[in-house]
Regions:
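NAD(P)+-binding Rossmann beta1-loop-alpha1 motif at the extreme N-terminus of oxidoreductases
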Residues: 1-67, 93, 98, 129
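Hydrophobic beta-strand scaffold residues
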Residues: 31, 51, 120-121, 162, ...
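Rossmann-fold NAD(P) dinucleotide-binding segment
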Residues: 55-67, 71-119
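Rossmann-fold dinucleotide-binding core
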Residues: 100-180
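Active-site-proximal catalytic alpha-helix in oxidoreductases
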Residues: 134-135, 139-142, 163, 167-199, ...
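Interdomain hinge/lid region at the active-site interface
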Residues: 168, 216-282
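NAD(P)-dependent dehydrogenase/reductase Rossmann-like domain
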Residues: 274-297
Length: 297
């Protein structure tokens, strides 16, 4: 892999993958993309990238393969099998999976890839669509130091805070903790919003002053307008946060860590899905609190 301009294949051009791949193109990388939606392929072409008709075609000549898909089943579907990445990427290629999946899936993928001579990093991100567009994502990485060092210039084109967290699966473990913190924080903000509204306080003024003190957070900064305007257009969908809460709950159980507050929030996220809100932004946790409080939904 060239240290300056490796040839990149990108699989998965969704809400996160599209702007991230475009930022690589802006940084001077040759990017060939594959996804199932033609409009996303057209967008990549318009940004200066190349598109492929299959995973095999996309990865065959790539130095680096980057994947960004919704969950573990999708990672397994694109990685394994005769048409998958492992059977078609060249020996010596570096596979960087930036999806948010279970730590064990990442560990298993790294083991399978090693048998094919393919190196792997798990590198999930935090920062949402805005962070992807602005190239200021936090990137938490699991894998070997040498592979991280080679991938770091790519990460620097995508994010701002980039950390090697440990061996394979460590990036996913840290991402699971991130999703726990974010969900609990959004839930706390949502409860505060309902409390303030039912108390007759000027909500905008209250959130402004709260965000200037110890209660302030990146979550409140990013989601304040969602609460004020009741704008729940995703963003990061409840469906995906439900998946992530399942990951952190299972992982915590496996290591014997108690997550009492996280477990309650996970159930509230699940309740939103059953009431048809799974496609909304995760700031729609406000709707769960409102239902419990007999307030506006």
């Amino acid at each position: 892999m060239s240290s300056t301009h490796p040839k990149v294949a990108w699989v998965g051009l969704g809400i996160m993958g599209s702007p991230m791949s475009e930022n690589l193109i802006k940084a001077g990388y040759d990017v060939t993309g594959f996804t199932l939606e033609q409009d996303k392929l057209d967008r990549l072409t318009a940004a200066g990238g190349t598109t492929a008709g299959s995973i095999a075609e996309a990865v065959r000549d790539a130095d680096v393969v980057i994947t960004m898909v919704p969950a573990s089943p999708q990672v397994e579907a694109i990685a394994y099998g005769p048409d998958g990445i492992l059977e078609n990427a060249r020996s010596g290629a570096l596979l960087i999976d930036m999806s948010s999946i279970t730590p064990q899936t990442s560990v298993d993928l790294a083991k399978a890839a090693k048998d094919k001579g393919i190196r792997v990093l798990d590198a999930p991100v935090s920062g949402g669509e805005a962070g992807a567009v602005e190239a200021v994502l936090s990137i938490m990485v699991g894998g070997e130091q040498a592979d991280f060092d080679q991938a770091e210039p790519i990460f620097e084109a995508l994010g701002k805070t980039i950390v090697l967290c440990g061996p394979h699966g460590s990036g996913q473990t840290v991402k699971a903790a991130n999703q726990l913190i974010v969900a609990v924080n959004i839930q706390a903000c949502a409860e505060a919003v309902v409390f303030l509204e039912k108390s007759g306080v000027d909500l905008k003024a209250a959130l402004d002053v709260l965000n200037g003190g110890l209660a302030g957070s990146t979550v409140l900064t990013r989601k304040k307008d969602n609460f004020l305007n009741r704008d729940f257009k995703p963003g990061f969908r409840i469906d995906l946060h439900h998946k992530d809460m399942g990951i952190v709950t299972d992982a915590a159980r496996n290591v014997g860590a108690a997550l009492p507050v996280g477990a309650v929030v996970a159930q509230l996220v699940a309740s939103l899905r059953t009431q048809g809100d799974g496609g909304l932004d995760h700031s729609a946790l406000l709707r769960a609190v409102e239902r419990l409080s007999g307030a506006q939904v």
